[in-house]
Protein backbone atom coordinates (compact mmCIF):
# COMPACT_ATOMS: atom_id res chain seq x y z
CA UNK A 1 0.00 0.00 0.00
CA UNK A 2 0.91 3.69 -0.11
CA UNK A 3 1.77 3.50 3.59
CA UNK A 4 2.97 0.38 5.37
CA UNK A 5 0.10 0.31 7.88
CA UNK A 6 -2.60 0.37 5.18
CA UNK A 7 -1.85 -2.65 3.03
CA UNK A 8 -4.95 -3.53 1.05
CA UNK A 9 -6.11 0.07 1.45
CA UNK A 10 -9.66 1.04 0.47
CA UNK A 11 -9.30 4.81 0.29
CA UNK A 12 -5.76 5.96 0.96
CA UNK A 13 -4.25 3.98 -1.91
CA UNK A 14 -6.84 5.50 -4.25
CA UNK A 15 -5.73 9.01 -3.35
CA UNK A 16 -2.04 8.14 -3.53
CA UNK A 17 -2.46 6.50 -6.95
CA UNK A 18 -4.49 9.38 -8.39
CA UNK A 19 -2.41 12.22 -6.95
CA UNK A 20 0.71 13.06 -4.96
CA UNK A 21 2.01 11.35 -1.83
CA UNK A 22 4.10 13.67 0.34
CA UNK A 23 6.60 11.74 2.44
CA UNK A 24 7.95 14.74 4.40
CA UNK A 25 4.88 16.69 5.43
CA UNK A 26 5.20 18.32 8.87
CA UNK A 27 2.53 19.83 11.07
CA UNK A 28 3.31 23.13 12.86
CA UNK A 29 2.67 21.51 16.26
CA UNK A 30 2.18 18.08 17.79
CA UNK A 31 -1.29 18.76 19.16
CA UNK A 32 -4.67 19.30 17.52
CA UNK A 33 -5.69 22.87 18.39
CA UNK A 34 -2.32 24.52 17.74
CA UNK A 35 -1.93 22.73 14.41
CA UNK A 36 -5.51 23.43 13.33
CA UNK A 37 -5.22 27.09 14.35
CA UNK A 38 -2.08 27.41 12.25
CA UNK A 39 -3.42 25.59 9.20
CA UNK A 40 -6.72 27.49 9.13
CA UNK A 41 -4.92 30.87 8.88
CA UNK A 42 -1.86 29.76 6.88
CA UNK A 43 0.67 31.05 9.42
CA UNK A 44 2.62 29.72 12.38
CA UNK A 45 0.55 29.72 15.55
CA UNK A 46 3.46 31.39 17.35
CA UNK A 47 3.30 34.33 14.93
CA UNK A 48 -0.28 35.15 15.92
CA UNK A 49 -0.31 34.30 19.64
CA UNK A 50 -2.57 31.27 19.16
CA UNK A 51 -0.04 28.63 20.19
CA UNK A 52 -1.33 27.56 23.63
CA UNK A 53 -3.55 24.48 23.48
CA UNK A 54 -7.27 25.13 23.80
CA UNK A 55 -7.05 28.81 24.59
CA UNK A 56 -9.38 31.47 23.24
CA UNK A 57 -12.60 29.99 24.58
CA UNK A 58 -14.72 31.12 27.50
CA UNK A 59 -15.65 27.61 28.61
CA UNK A 60 -14.66 24.06 27.88
CA UNK A 61 -16.86 21.04 28.58
CA UNK A 62 -19.13 23.16 30.76
CA UNK A 63 -16.36 24.71 32.85
CA UNK A 64 -15.90 28.49 32.97
CA UNK A 65 -12.23 29.11 32.20
CA UNK A 66 -12.26 32.84 32.89
CA UNK A 67 -11.92 35.96 30.74
CA UNK A 68 -8.24 35.47 29.85
CA UNK A 69 -9.20 32.59 27.56
CA UNK A 70 -12.07 34.48 25.99
CA UNK A 71 -9.93 37.47 24.99
CA UNK A 72 -7.59 35.68 22.57
CA UNK A 73 -8.52 36.79 19.07
CA UNK A 74 -6.93 36.90 15.65
CA UNK A 75 -5.25 40.20 14.74
CA UNK A 76 -7.42 42.67 12.87
CA UNK A 77 -7.69 41.80 9.20
CA UNK A 78 -6.71 38.14 9.60
CA UNK A 79 -9.43 35.81 8.35
CA UNK A 80 -9.72 32.04 8.46
CA UNK A 81 -9.62 29.95 5.31
CA UNK A 82 -13.36 29.11 5.25
CA UNK A 83 -14.24 32.78 5.72
CA UNK A 84 -12.13 33.67 2.67
CA UNK A 85 -13.76 30.95 0.59
CA UNK A 86 -17.21 31.99 1.76
CA UNK A 87 -16.50 35.61 0.79
CA UNK A 88 -15.51 34.35 -2.67
CA UNK A 89 -18.91 32.71 -3.14
CA UNK A 90 -18.10 29.18 -2.02
CA UNK A 91 -20.41 26.99 0.05
CA UNK A 92 -18.52 25.96 3.21
CA UNK A 93 -19.03 23.10 5.63
CA UNK A 94 -17.31 21.37 8.54
CA UNK A 95 -18.14 17.69 8.96
CA UNK A 96 -17.18 16.10 12.26
CA UNK A 97 -17.96 18.95 14.64
CA UNK A 98 -14.35 19.90 15.44
CA UNK A 99 -13.42 23.56 15.04
CA UNK A 100 -10.63 23.37 17.59
CA UNK A 101 -9.05 26.81 17.20
CA UNK A 102 -7.10 28.72 19.85
CA UNK A 103 -8.88 32.00 19.26
CA UNK A 104 -12.39 33.28 19.70
CA UNK A 105 -14.40 32.52 16.58
CA UNK A 106 -17.97 32.07 15.41
CA UNK A 107 -18.46 28.83 13.44
CA UNK A 108 -21.64 30.28 11.92
CA UNK A 109 -19.54 33.01 10.27
CA UNK A 110 -17.18 30.39 8.88
CA UNK A 111 -19.48 27.61 7.68
CA UNK A 112 -22.76 27.46 5.80
CA UNK A 113 -23.39 23.94 7.04
CA UNK A 114 -22.49 22.33 10.35
CA UNK A 115 -23.92 18.78 10.59
CA UNK A 116 -25.93 17.62 13.55
CA UNK A 117 -23.67 16.32 16.31
CA UNK A 118 -22.66 12.84 15.22
CA UNK A 119 -19.08 12.70 16.39
CA UNK A 120 -16.05 12.43 14.15
CA UNK A 121 -16.61 10.79 10.81
CA UNK A 122 -18.11 11.36 7.36
CA UNK A 123 -21.73 10.39 8.12
CA UNK A 124 -23.35 13.63 6.89
CA UNK A 125 -21.06 13.79 3.86
CA UNK A 126 -21.78 10.19 2.90
CA UNK A 127 -25.49 11.03 3.13
CA UNK A 128 -24.94 13.98 0.78
CA UNK A 129 -26.06 16.50 3.40
CA UNK A 130 -22.87 18.58 3.39
CA UNK A 131 -23.38 20.02 -0.09
CA UNK A 132 -27.10 19.60 -0.75
CA UNK A 133 -27.86 23.18 0.39
CA UNK A 134 -25.68 24.75 -2.31
CA UNK A 135 -27.03 26.79 -5.15
CA UNK A 136 -26.84 25.06 -8.52
CA UNK A 137 -23.24 25.04 -9.69
CA UNK A 138 -21.93 26.68 -6.51
CA UNK A 139 -18.41 25.48 -5.62
CA UNK A 140 -17.69 24.28 -2.10
CA UNK A 141 -14.91 24.26 0.48
CA UNK A 142 -15.27 21.55 3.10
CA UNK A 143 -13.44 20.14 6.10
CA UNK A 144 -14.01 16.55 7.20
CA UNK A 145 -12.73 15.49 10.62
CA UNK A 146 -12.02 11.78 11.06
CA UNK A 147 -11.30 10.21 14.43
CA UNK A 148 -8.04 8.54 13.44
CA UNK A 149 -6.27 7.19 16.50
CA UNK A 150 -9.15 8.34 18.73
CA UNK A 151 -11.75 5.99 17.25
CA UNK A 152 -11.64 3.77 20.32
CA UNK A 153 -13.91 0.74 20.19
CA UNK A 154 -15.28 1.75 16.79
CA UNK A 155 -12.11 0.32 15.27
CA UNK A 156 -12.40 -3.49 14.94
CA UNK A 157 -9.48 -5.55 16.21
CA UNK A 158 -7.50 -6.69 13.18
CA UNK A 159 -3.80 -6.22 13.93
CA UNK A 160 -1.99 -8.85 16.03
CA UNK A 161 -0.10 -7.12 18.89
CA UNK A 162 2.62 -9.76 18.66
CA UNK A 163 3.58 -8.54 15.19
CA UNK A 164 3.82 -4.78 15.69
CA UNK A 165 7.16 -2.95 15.90
CA UNK A 166 7.92 -1.39 19.30
CA UNK A 167 10.19 1.70 19.23
CA UNK A 168 13.22 1.45 21.55
CA UNK A 169 12.02 4.40 23.67
CA UNK A 170 9.02 2.31 24.84
CA UNK A 171 9.31 -0.79 27.04
CA UNK A 172 8.43 -3.89 25.02
CA UNK A 173 5.53 -5.04 27.18
CA UNK A 174 2.04 -6.38 26.31
CA UNK A 175 0.29 -3.08 27.18
CA UNK A 176 2.45 -1.14 24.73
CA UNK A 177 1.98 -3.73 22.00
CA UNK A 178 -1.79 -3.60 22.48
CA UNK A 179 -1.77 0.20 22.25
CA UNK A 180 0.27 0.18 19.04
CA UNK A 181 -1.89 -2.54 17.48
CA UNK A 182 -5.01 -0.56 18.35
CA UNK A 183 -3.51 2.50 16.66
CA UNK A 184 -3.02 0.51 13.46
CA UNK A 185 -6.59 -0.78 13.77
CA UNK A 186 -7.78 2.84 13.93
CA UNK A 187 -5.78 3.67 10.81
CA UNK A 188 -7.44 0.83 8.92
CA UNK A 189 -10.86 2.17 9.97
CA UNK A 190 -9.81 5.66 8.90
CA UNK A 191 -8.78 4.26 5.52
CA UNK A 192 -12.27 2.79 5.18
CA UNK A 193 -13.79 6.21 5.92
CA UNK A 194 -11.57 7.87 3.30
CA UNK A 195 -12.95 5.33 0.83
CA UNK A 196 -16.51 6.30 1.82
CA UNK A 197 -15.75 9.98 1.18
CA UNK A 198 -14.35 9.21 -2.27
CA UNK A 199 -17.38 7.05 -3.08
CA UNK A 200 -19.81 9.81 -2.01
CA UNK A 201 -18.04 12.39 -4.18
CA UNK A 202 -18.16 10.03 -7.16
CA UNK A 203 -21.82 9.17 -6.55
CA UNK A 204 -22.81 12.84 -6.64
CA UNK A 205 -20.65 13.64 -9.67
CA UNK A 206 -18.22 15.82 -7.70
CA UNK A 207 -15.05 13.76 -7.50
CA UNK A 208 -13.47 14.78 -10.81
CA UNK A 209 -13.76 18.48 -9.95
CA UNK A 210 -12.73 18.33 -6.29
CA UNK A 211 -9.21 18.95 -4.98
CA UNK A 212 -8.66 16.71 -1.95
CA UNK A 213 -6.07 17.22 0.79
CA UNK A 214 -5.80 14.24 3.14
CA UNK A 215 -3.54 14.60 6.19
CA UNK A 216 -3.34 14.27 9.96
CA UNK A 217 -3.08 17.13 12.44
CA UNK A 218 -0.64 15.34 14.79
CA UNK A 219 0.87 11.98 15.55
CA UNK A 220 0.13 8.90 17.61
CA UNK A 221 -1.64 9.55 20.93
CA UNK A 222 0.88 7.77 23.16
CA UNK A 223 3.70 9.47 25.09
CA UNK A 224 6.53 11.22 23.21
CA UNK A 225 4.46 11.43 20.02
CA UNK A 226 1.32 13.56 20.41
CA UNK A 227 2.03 17.01 21.93
CA UNK A 228 5.76 16.73 21.23
CA UNK A 229 7.83 17.76 18.21
CA UNK A 230 9.77 14.57 17.61
CA UNK A 231 9.10 12.94 14.23
CA UNK A 232 6.29 10.83 15.69
CA UNK A 233 4.43 13.97 16.74
CA UNK A 234 4.79 16.15 13.65
CA UNK A 235 5.82 14.15 10.56
CA UNK A 236 2.53 13.04 9.04
CA UNK A 237 1.26 11.35 5.89
CA UNK A 238 -0.35 13.67 3.34
CA UNK A 239 -1.86 13.10 -0.09
CA UNK A 240 -3.29 15.60 -2.56
CA UNK A 241 -5.43 14.52 -5.51
CA UNK A 242 -7.73 16.29 -7.93
CA UNK A 243 -7.85 18.52 -11.01
CA UNK A 244 -4.43 19.55 -12.28
CA UNK A 245 -2.57 17.08 -10.05
CA UNK A 246 -0.56 14.47 -11.96
CA UNK A 247 -1.24 10.92 -10.78
CA UNK A 248 1.15 8.59 -9.04
CA UNK A 249 3.71 11.12 -7.83
CA UNK A 250 5.82 10.84 -4.68
CA UNK A 251 7.46 13.98 -3.31
CA UNK A 252 10.14 13.95 -0.65
CA UNK A 253 10.68 17.70 -0.25
CA UNK A 254 9.68 19.44 2.98
CA UNK A 255 6.08 20.68 3.24
CA UNK A 256 4.57 22.50 6.24
CA UNK A 257 0.96 22.58 7.36
CA UNK A 258 1.01 26.35 6.86
CA UNK A 259 1.39 25.70 3.12
CA UNK A 260 -2.06 24.12 2.81
CA UNK A 261 -4.09 27.35 3.01
CA UNK A 262 -2.20 29.22 0.26
CA UNK A 263 -2.31 26.09 -1.93
CA UNK A 264 -6.10 25.89 -1.49
CA UNK A 265 -6.63 29.58 -2.23
CA UNK A 266 -4.37 29.53 -5.27
CA UNK A 267 -6.15 26.51 -6.71
CA UNK A 268 -9.44 28.42 -6.43
CA UNK A 269 -8.02 31.60 -7.94
CA UNK A 270 -8.39 33.53 -4.68
CA UNK A 271 -5.67 36.01 -3.72
CA UNK A 272 -3.39 34.81 -0.91
CA UNK A 273 -3.39 37.46 1.88
CA UNK A 274 -0.18 38.95 3.21
CA UNK A 275 -0.47 37.46 6.70
CA UNK A 276 -0.02 33.93 5.35
CA UNK A 277 3.49 32.57 5.88
CA UNK A 278 3.09 29.43 3.78
CA UNK A 279 3.58 28.89 0.05
CA UNK A 280 1.61 27.16 -2.71
CA UNK A 281 3.53 23.89 -2.98
CA UNK A 282 1.46 22.86 -6.03
CA UNK A 283 2.54 25.86 -8.11
CA UNK A 284 4.80 25.32 -11.12
CA UNK A 285 7.20 28.01 -9.87
CA UNK A 286 7.26 26.75 -6.27
CA UNK A 287 10.67 26.96 -4.60
CA UNK A 288 11.34 24.00 -2.33
CA UNK A 289 11.64 24.71 1.37
CA UNK A 290 15.03 24.71 3.05
CA UNK A 291 13.41 23.96 6.42
CA UNK A 292 10.16 23.60 8.34
CA UNK A 293 9.47 24.74 11.90
CA UNK A 294 7.32 23.24 14.66
CA UNK A 295 6.51 24.40 18.20
CA UNK A 296 5.35 22.88 21.47
CA UNK A 297 3.82 25.19 24.07
CA UNK A 298 1.30 24.86 26.90
CA UNK A 299 -0.88 21.79 26.53
CA UNK A 300 -3.79 21.68 28.97
CA UNK A 301 -2.13 22.58 32.32
CA UNK A 302 1.35 21.42 31.32
CA UNK A 303 3.69 24.37 30.81
CA UNK A 304 6.28 23.70 28.13
CA UNK A 305 8.28 25.43 25.40
CA UNK A 306 10.11 23.39 22.75
CA UNK A 307 11.04 24.35 19.19
CA UNK A 308 12.04 22.16 16.25
CA UNK A 309 13.67 23.03 12.94
CA UNK A 310 13.86 20.35 10.26
CA UNK A 311 16.02 20.53 7.13
CA UNK A 312 16.33 17.90 4.38
CA UNK A 313 19.29 16.37 6.28
CA UNK A 314 19.12 17.47 9.92
CA UNK A 315 16.79 18.25 12.81
CA UNK A 316 17.45 20.79 15.56
CA UNK A 317 15.48 20.64 18.83
CA UNK A 318 15.62 23.24 21.58
CA UNK A 319 14.12 22.71 25.02
CA UNK A 320 13.66 26.05 26.77
CA UNK A 321 12.31 24.78 30.11
CA UNK A 322 15.06 22.35 31.02
CA UNK A 323 14.11 22.45 34.70
CA UNK A 324 10.93 20.53 33.90
CA UNK A 325 10.70 16.82 33.05
CA UNK A 326 9.14 15.70 29.78
CA UNK A 327 6.56 13.70 31.75
CA UNK A 328 4.72 16.49 33.54
CA UNK A 329 1.18 15.90 34.88
CA UNK A 330 -1.07 15.02 31.94
CA UNK A 331 -4.55 13.89 31.01
CA UNK A 332 -2.85 10.61 30.06
CA UNK A 333 -1.90 9.88 33.68
CA UNK A 334 -4.97 7.67 34.43
CA UNK A 335 -4.31 5.43 31.42
CA UNK A 336 -3.18 1.89 32.36
CA UNK A 337 -0.11 2.21 30.15
CA UNK A 338 0.87 5.48 31.87
CA UNK A 339 0.55 3.90 35.29
CA UNK A 340 2.66 0.98 34.12
CA UNK A 341 5.37 3.34 32.84
CA UNK A 342 5.44 5.13 36.21
CA UNK A 343 5.65 1.85 38.08
CA UNK A 344 8.48 0.59 35.87
CA UNK A 345 10.45 3.79 36.30
CA UNK A 346 10.04 3.69 40.10
CA UNK A 347 11.28 0.08 40.17
CA UNK A 348 14.27 0.79 37.94
CA UNK A 349 12.93 -1.39 35.12
CA UNK A 350 13.45 1.12 32.31
CA UNK A 351 16.66 1.15 30.31
CA UNK A 352 18.88 4.13 29.53
CA UNK A 353 17.16 4.89 26.23
CA UNK A 354 13.68 4.89 27.80
CA UNK A 355 14.77 7.08 30.71
CA UNK A 356 15.75 9.89 28.33
CA UNK A 357 12.05 10.72 28.04
CA UNK A 358 10.46 9.05 31.06
CA UNK A 359 13.12 10.01 33.59
CA UNK A 360 12.89 12.84 36.17
CA UNK A 361 15.04 15.31 34.18
CA UNK A 362 15.44 16.43 30.58
Where would I find each of the regions flagged by the language model?
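Formylglycine-dependent sulfatase
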Residues: 1-360
Amino acid sequence: GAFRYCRGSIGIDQLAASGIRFDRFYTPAGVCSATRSSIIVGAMQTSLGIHNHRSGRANFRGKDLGPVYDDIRLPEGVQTLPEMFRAAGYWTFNEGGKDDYNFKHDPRAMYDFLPRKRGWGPAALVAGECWEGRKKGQPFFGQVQLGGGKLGRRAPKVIDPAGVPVPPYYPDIPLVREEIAHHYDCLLKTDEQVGQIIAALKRDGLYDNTLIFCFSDHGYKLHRHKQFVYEGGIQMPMMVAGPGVAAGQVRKDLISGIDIAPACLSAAGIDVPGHMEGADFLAEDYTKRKFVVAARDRCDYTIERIRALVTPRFKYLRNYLTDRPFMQPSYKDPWPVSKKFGDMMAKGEMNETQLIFFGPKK
